[in-house]
Design a protein with these regions (language model features):
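N-terminal positively charged helical leader segments and presequences
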Residues: 1-88
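RNA substrate-binding interface of SAM-dependent RNA methyltransferases
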Residues: 19, 49, 58, 87-182
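Short, acidic/turn-prone active-site loops that include or flank metal/cofactor-
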Residues: 36, 62-63, 130-132, 200-202, ...
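Short, glycine/polar-rich helix-capping loops at beta-to-alpha or helix-loop-helix junctions
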Residues: 44-45, 132-138, 202-208
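Short, hinge-like loop/turn segments at secondary-structure boundaries
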Residues: 74-75, 141-146, 190-193
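Structured adenosyl-cofactor binding patch, chiefly the S-adenosyl-L-methionine
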Residues: 141-144, 209-248
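Active-site/ligand-binding-proximal alpha/beta "capping" segment
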Residues: 173-228
Length: 248
């Protein structure tokens, strides 16, 4: 697995900035704020800025310095490690739930999935190094700060990693329309589980699907016969959360 050591990133917006400032995972390089902007007046952001050296905060009048995205008047530059080296928690936690992305190529979808997964209490995201959206600034931006609280594992072979998970007592659930598929709510996710979702156009690859212990599907009644991968992921990860909360 690859680790991006001290790679520098830039994000904009109040939520992203606050999340990064409050995290101990990253080194802050610079915070740029437009004077009298929404960000400049935000109490939560100003409180979070007290956590860093104020010399790193620069207030400017020129709005053109933050012309991309909907910035709300703030950008943050930071560095750090986003990708974890190993599955260090596997021996400790008996109800881990991981999300596995099999060649999800759209950065917007990747970012939205991160946000959804973090809200649903997913413990980590595994994704392929090749033929997948990289963990870049667009992905981080769309996640709205959720990436700060998520572990990421970049792998070269999804199928091999799933087999490793099986050896660590994980059940593998693939989300795919299939004759053998069961409704997503009829599968148990309260034990160690890895949920696999596929690419936007092609779904889960055949060999990866063959590795799964269960195939889940989301029944539909409309004329449109498919969901966006982000929407489909949302349904299954929140079902996982519902079962865990019900079990407690």
């Amino acid at each position: 697995m690859q680790t991006f050591n001290n790679k520098t990133f830039n994000c904009v917006g109040i939520n992203n900035t606050i999340s990064i400032l409050r995290s101990n995972r990253f080194q802050i390089v610079k915070v740029l704020i437009i004077k009298n902007s929404k960000a400049d007046k935000d109490r939560g952001l100003n409180s979070a800025l007290n956590l860093i050296n104020r010399d790193l905060v620069q207030k400017v009048s020129d709005k053109k310095l933050l012309s991309n995205f909907k910035t709300q008047g703030v950008s943050i530059t930071f560095s750090g490690d986003l990708i974890s080296d190993e599955f260090s928690d596997f021996e400790k936690n008996e109800d881990l739930c991981l999300l596995v992305l099999d060649r999800v190529e759209d950065p917007q979808n990747f970012g939205q999935i991160i946000r959804t997964a973090e809200c649903a209490g997913i413990d980590g995201i595994i994704y392929s190094r090749h033929h997948s959206a990289p963990l870049n600034e667009t992905v981080l931006q769309v996640s709205q700060g959720a990436f700060v609280n998520m572990k990421f594992y970049e792998v070269t072979n999804i199928r091999n990693e799933l087999n490793k998970l099986k050896k660590n007592n994980f059940w593998i659930v693939g989300l795919e329309n299939s004759i053998d598929a069961k409704p997503w709510y009829s599968i148990e996710y309260s034990d160690r589980t890895a949920i696999v979702v596929g690419s936007e156009g092609r779904g889960i690859r055949k060999k990866v699907l063959e590795t799964c212990d269960f195939i889940a599907t989301i029944p539909m009644q409309g004329i449109t016969n498919s969901l966006n991968v982000g929407a489909a992921t949302s349904a299954i990860v929140f079902e996982s959360l519902r079962q865990k909360l019900e079990k407690k």
